[in-house]
Amino acid sequence: MAWVWALVLLAALGSARAERDCRVSSFRVKENFDKARFSGTWYAMAKKDPEGLFLQDNIVAEFSVDENGQMSATAKGRVRLLNNWDVCADMVGTFTDTEDSAKFKMKYWGVASFLQKGNDDHWIIDTDYDTYAVQYSCRLLNLDGTCADSYSFVFARDPNGLPPDVQKIVRQRQDELCLARQYRLIVHNGYCDGKSEQNIL
């Protein structure tokens, strides 16, 4: 009888794996995404890091939409250089629309040359516009369609974080992106508030 239960367990595990499709093309994004409602200030609460040097914590992003409907963003955060030099740095991004309202091509660069620059996919996986947002980008695909180098942010409107019911939604989205337990929490301790010029790049 034990072998019957073993088979049932294996079938259940196989079914769970089959349900989670980790090919990037299978990931769902926010339907009918509204850039205007998304604009404004967002605080990064958690991040799945990519390869390269990016903002590390105290990350605050400001999204805006111009009169032509073009979305752009600026972000400020702390970066640690040479293992012991903390500076506040700025990044800038411009977004090109695609056929899907929640999928963009984002050209980004650091105001300081040591930060990464590139032109990545930028997908809004989910948001309620007023509380939370989950962003995702795959920079390099594996041959099987899964992602070899990705990054993802969990944003909040409130710098103090997300309420428990929203955290549950966010964890579900992270799992759907096959990134469960791969995020690190982003500290907001005011490091980049009121810094003197020599500490800002």
From Swiss-Prot:
Residues with PTM Omega-N-methylarginine: R139
BP GO annotations: retinol transport
Assembly and binders: Interacts with TTR. Interaction with TTR prevents its loss by filtration through the kidney glomeruli. Interacts with STRA6.
Function in brief: Retinol-binding protein that mediates retinol transport in blood plasma. Delivers retinol from the liver stores to the peripheral tissues. Transfers the bound all-trans retinol to STRA6, that then facilitates retinol transport across the cell membrane.
Residues bound to substrate: Q116
GO molecular function: retinal binding; retinol binding; retinol transmembrane transporter activity
Database matches in Gene3D superfamilies: 2.40.128.20
Recorded name of the encoding gene: RBP4
Protein name: Retinol binding protein 4
Cellular localisation: Secreted
